[in-house]
């Protein structure tokens, strides 16, 4: 593979990663299709995907740095309040409660989850995740109980974390699972999306660090330019995607995203079967 060819592939995959990582459409589904069509598969490709995810994570940190640093600075040493008594400020406890279910299941079943990473499972996950988005739009309360991030309760944060466990199924979409869960729990579409982004930082950093540690041996110095291009591209595109997405969901529902997931599932079937 020539240098220019590899850099072009890196840029294309960086765009795909940046566009899809935080939208409820499954970055995994898109990456396996595009990677297959480009002929970029195998251990190096998996390591590359792990590295460029860091670019997407950095975009969230840049977008929400005030909120993230504010969370770190909040004192939360007092005991947990009862349901309904903790409204008024999003705290680090909300993030921790949102992390616990997926972290526990992810550590317990890491190898099993990795074994699910194949086109057929991704295709089914795309469909089921799309159905969940439709269900969330149809079944959500008419008036959200938590219109803003600072209105969320600990219970809502924990239940969103439980929904996040669905994203351990490759192709389901972490953002799709958490946003749908938030809406079903009475969090507004916009606030659920913001919480999903904030929750992504520790979750994705932890998962990416673990994957990078396990796949570090496949990275060579010759890969650095390609990985750098993918990282930077994913970062820039993710910044644009997040800003656009947060504006878009003020005006439209998630039904179009669900339909798009069904189309991607069909594309997976056509490409691989």
Swiss-Prot record:
<keyword id="KW-1003">Cell membrane</keyword>
<comment type="function">
    <text>Catalyzes the dephosphorylation of undecaprenyl diphosphate (UPP). Confers resistance to bacitracin.</text>
</comment>
<comment type="similarity">
    <text>Belongs to the UppP family.</text>
</comment>
<keyword id="KW-0812">Transmembrane</keyword>
<dbReference type="GO" id="GO:0005886">
    <property type="term" value="C:plasma membrane"/>
</dbReference>
<dbReference type="GO" id="GO:0008360">
    <property type="term" value="P:regulation of cell shape"/>
</dbReference>
<keyword id="KW-0573">Peptidoglycan synthesis</keyword>
<protein>
    <recommendedName>
        <fullName>Undecaprenyl-diphosphatase</fullName>
        <ecNumber>3.6.1.27</ecNumber>
    </recommendedName>
</protein>
<dbReference type="Pfam" id="PF02673">
    <property type="entry name" value="BacA"/>
</dbReference>
<feature type="transmembrane region" description="Helical">
    <location>
        <begin position="116"/>
        <end position="136"/>
    </location>
</feature>
<keyword id="KW-1133">Transmembrane helix</keyword>
<feature type="transmembrane region" description="Helical">
    <location>
        <begin position="6"/>
        <end position="26"/>
    </location>
</feature>
<feature type="transmembrane region" description="Helical">
    <location>
        <begin position="45"/>
        <end position="65"/>
    </location>
</feature>
<feature type="transmembrane region" description="Helical">
    <location>
        <begin position="190"/>
        <end position="210"/>
    </location>
</feature>
<dbReference type="GO" id="GO:0046677">
    <property type="term" value="P:response to antibiotic"/>
</dbReference>
<keyword id="KW-0133">Cell shape</keyword>
<keyword id="KW-0997">Cell inner membrane</keyword>
<dbReference type="GO" id="GO:0050380">
    <property type="term" value="F:undecaprenyl-diphosphatase activity"/>
</dbReference>
<dbReference type="GO" id="GO:0009252">
    <property type="term" value="P:peptidoglycan biosynthetic process"/>
</dbReference>
<feature type="transmembrane region" description="Helical">
    <location>
        <begin position="90"/>
        <end position="110"/>
    </location>
</feature>
<feature type="transmembrane region" description="Helical">
    <location>
        <begin position="222"/>
        <end position="242"/>
    </location>
</feature>
<dbReference type="GO" id="GO:0071555">
    <property type="term" value="P:cell wall organization"/>
</dbReference>
<keyword id="KW-0472">Membrane</keyword>
<keyword id="KW-0046">Antibiotic resistance</keyword>
<keyword id="KW-0961">Cell wall biogenesis/degradation</keyword>
<dbReference type="InterPro" id="IPR003824">
    <property type="entry name" value="UppP"/>
</dbReference>
<feature type="transmembrane region" description="Helical">
    <location>
        <begin position="252"/>
        <end position="272"/>
    </location>
</feature>
<keyword id="KW-0378">Hydrolase</keyword>
